[in-house]
Amino acid sequence: MKGRDGCVQLGVDVYGGALLNPWFDRDLAIAGRVTLLSASGELCSTLFDSTRPVAVVPSLAIHLDRDANKQRSINPQKDVVPLVMLGDPQQFDFKEWLAETLTFQDAQWQDARVMDYELSLYDVQAPAVAGMDESWITSARLDNLLSCFAGLSALIDADDAEWSMLVAVSYT
């Protein structure tokens, strides 16, 4: 954790060739895999999802950034830094927050200690049918979801009578 101007910031890294502009001013939840040491001393792994917004990457108001609508480059390490709360980062323990949130979601983790985690932020805005005639479907990651759906549909509907080669690729 780091901080600036009375805010606790989450240290993140951009994965892959990300389009960075859409991450600004979105309600972001956090999810992924958490590795814990159980009360009995067993190393365990579980999936975690905050299920609610816990972070935001704020953009500057237009009067503080007059060039915001002109061509600009975004520095991921400087500009894409999610805020998670007000306060002193020295007083906030992310692993403790994870342990408390996991325990709230599932009591079996009550005395477990978080050892490590691999988490990602995601936009919690729900998909929608949009347009005055409801002709559009809007959603984050729609390109990936549609290509997976089309590929899976092709696999399911493949005709056994004729030989064909289908390839499934996962980018997770």
Which functions belong to the PLM regions below?
Residues 1-171:
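N-terminal hydrophobic/helix-forming segments and targeting peptides
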